[in-house]
A protein has these predicted regions:
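Short beta-strand/turn micro-motifs composed of small residues
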Residues: 12, 35, 96
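A short, basic/flexible loop-to-alpha-helix module at the beginning of a structural domain
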Residues: 1-5
Length: 259
């Protein structure tokens, strides 16, 4: 029996597929990534926020320090490999929206686990109504997911490890310890399709719950350099541009901008 060309076929080159491919190739595995040039990809437009403090109660994510350490090392490896800057730290100024949230904030200030992550904000903010104050969230980071996908795709192409095509599931063939697609054969296939897995005949019955988020790219009217969050968020991107993000919609999940 002929040996398959690849160890893995990876369907989807979003953030998950890209990082998986990078890790497998670093371990000497033969990988082919198949993607339709990120059409409809959430990773392509994602803000890439790494946020240690979340929720109404300003909770520190369990295990954040370990997760962040691992993520930082990974993105540094990608930066060195791709020769681009992918991750940056940014202060986050969060609006305290009511008395209850302000109470949680003052409680967090007295907790040792939160010392490295939260403090009273002493700088000017863009918020007009700060009746309950603002908090500074430290160790927030932004990953440039669009740049990561673009440069990693080129890196794959240069290594003959990328195929730009729409996957027709009916053309996937399975045998013992082998999967084939068009002219490719591999030992395994891994689907990294994000929400598009709802159309995958082998995954469509899983209990997916789709959500639609939207991001506006807007002209900056301020030289404020911190991320602002108040349920929505505003991130300075360049000298002239900022990104404004919304909450999620659970019912309207098409790819069109909302009115």
């Amino acid at each position: 029996m002929p040996v398959p060309q690849f160890d893995y076929l990876i369907i989807g080159q979003g953030l998950a597929g890209s990082i998986l491919a990078f890790q497998l190739i670093a371990r000497g595995q033969r990988v082919m990534v198949i993607d339709n040039d990120h059409k409809g990809s959430a990773s392509q437009v994602a803000a890439g926020i790494i946020n240690p403090i979340t929720g109404h109660r300003l909770n520190l994510t369990d295990g954040f320090a370990d997760y962040y350490s691992s993520a930082s090392k990974l993105y540094q490896q990608l930066e060195q490999t791709l020769e681009v800057s992918l991750i940056r730290k940014i202060d986050q100024v969060r609006l305290l929206k009511n008395l209850g949230q302000a109470s949680y904030f003052h409680k967090r200030l007295d907790q040792d686990d939160y010392v490295d992550f939260i403090e009273t904000n002493k700088e000017a903010s863009l918020f007009k109504n700060t009746e309950y104050g603002t908090a500074k969230i430290k160790q927030t980071s932004i990953v440039d997911t669009e740049l990561l996908l673009q440069t990693f795709k080129k890196w794959l192409v240069d290594r003959n490890a990328y195929c730009n095509t729409f996957v027709d599931y009916s053309e996937l063939g399975f045998a013992v310890d082998e999967v084939s697609y068009q002219d490719f054969s591999a030992n395994r296939v891994i689907f990294c399709e994000g929400y598009q897995a709802i159309n995958n005949p082998w995954l469509k019955d899983l209990p997916f719950k789709l959500a639609k988020g939207e991001i506006l790219t807007i002209e900056r009217q301020s030289n404020h350099e911190s991320m602002m969050s108040w349920g929505n968020w505003l991130i300075p991107s360049t000298n002239d541009v900022a990104k404004l993000g919304s909450n999620y919609a659970w019912n309207d999940t098409d790819l069109q901008p909302s009115d």
